[in-house]
Amino acid sequence: MTPPMCSNSFFNHSSSIDHDSLPTKIVAGSSVSSFFCFLLEDSSSSSSSASSDLRFLSLDSSFSLSLSEDEDEDESELEDSFDSSFLVSSFSSSSSSSEEESEEEEEESLDSSFLVSASLSLSEDDEEEDSESEDEDEDEDSDSDSDSDSDSDEDEDEDEDSEEEEETALAFSSLACLEALTSFLLPFTLVVLAILFYPAWVE
């Protein structure tokens, strides 16, 4: 603010006064006017300083308000970013936990399917082994039956052979008996016949 100029008619009653010659020409009216001008200038300077102080205070307060608003905005932005980062981290953690749960469920399902397939394969192997053992038992039974049949046939053949041998032995023994009997009876019969028919032959 520019200080007000001393333009009052009371102070400027003498237009012919040269202000440059105030120190040399001392006039009562001019000294009074200069004194009041000094007072007015002092009051105007004080008012201008006060207004400048007020302006500075207003600028300072507006600057502080703008700074506080900026700080509030920064804090709100930080809070928003923190909230967004927290939401992102929570979402990522939840998604990772859900992925881990899904992976665990898949592993459990794979393990259960593997166990089921392993049990089925073991049961199939057991059934195959049982069928093979049954076939082997049947083969052994058939072999034993065939062996028993062959043994019985061999026994029958041996019995027949032994019977034939016994029969041949009996025949040979009977022939031997006949030969012995004939060898004994033939001279005896000749002697008996000679005794019986000798007198007839003599006559």
Swiss-Prot record:
GO terms for cellular component: membrane. It is found in: Membrane. Coiled coil: none annotated. The keyword Transmembrane helix applies. Residues 68-82, 98-110, 123-168 have a biased composition (Acidic residues). Keywords: Membrane, Transmembrane, Transmembrane helix. Residues 111-122 have a biased composition (Low complexity). It is a single-pass membrane protein. Its main location: membrane. Residues 65-84, 92-170 are annotated as: Disordered. The chain crosses the membrane at residues 182-202. Almost completely overlaps NSR1. This is Putative uncharacterized protein YGR160W.
